[in-house]
Amino acid sequence: VKYWLTFNEINSSVAPMGALLNQGILNDLENPTVFMEQPDIPQQRFQGLHHMFVASALAVKMAHEIDPEYKVGNMMIYAASYPLTCNPKDVLVCQKYNRLYNYYCADVQAYGAYPAYADSLLKEMGVVLEKEAGDEEILKNGTVDFITFSYYMSSCQTADSKEKSGEGNILGGVLNPYLKASDWGWQIDPEGLRYPFSTTISGK
C-alpha cells in the first residue's frame, strides 16, 4: 500500500456536529446519542481541529521517513455551495461559507500554514487558538501529497433568513430552486461534483 489518508472528512470539525462525530467530544453526558443537540463550544472544537492538523502533519512526515514513495493525503467532505441569488450579500455569505467548510482545512494541510482569512473567521466565533512551540514548523513540514473528498449534495447560501433550509442538510444551506431532492431531502446535483476539482484550495 502506497497511498494513505490521515483523518476522514476532517473538515466536518468546522460544523457543530463535528465535535462528537469527528473529534469524539461529548459535552452532554445525559444525551450522548443526540449529536445534533450537543452543546457547541467553538473554542473547544477548533482547538481540537488544530491538534488534528498537527497530528496529520506528523503522520505525513513519519510516512515519508518510513518509505519515501508513500503518498499521504487528507480527506474532506466537499460541501458544494452556491449563492442563492446574485445579490452581493448572498455572494459574500457564500464566500464565507466556502472558506470555512471547503478551504480552511485544505489550505492548512496543503500549504502548511493557516490562511490569511482564518484570523477573521476564528475571531468572529470567539476562537483563540493555543499553539504549542513547534506547531507551525510541524505544519510547514507535513503538508499532504494530495487532496481527497467525499461528495453528497450541494446547497445554496443566502443572507435572507426567511429562506427555507434544505431538509436533511446537516452542513447548512437553503434549497436550490433548480434542483430536485431525494426522498430524504438531499438535493441531487451531479454537476456539483465537478466544482471541487478547481476549488478545494483557495489559491491564497
Segments predicted by a language model, with ranges:
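Active-site region of glycoside hydrolase catalytic domains
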Residues: 1-204
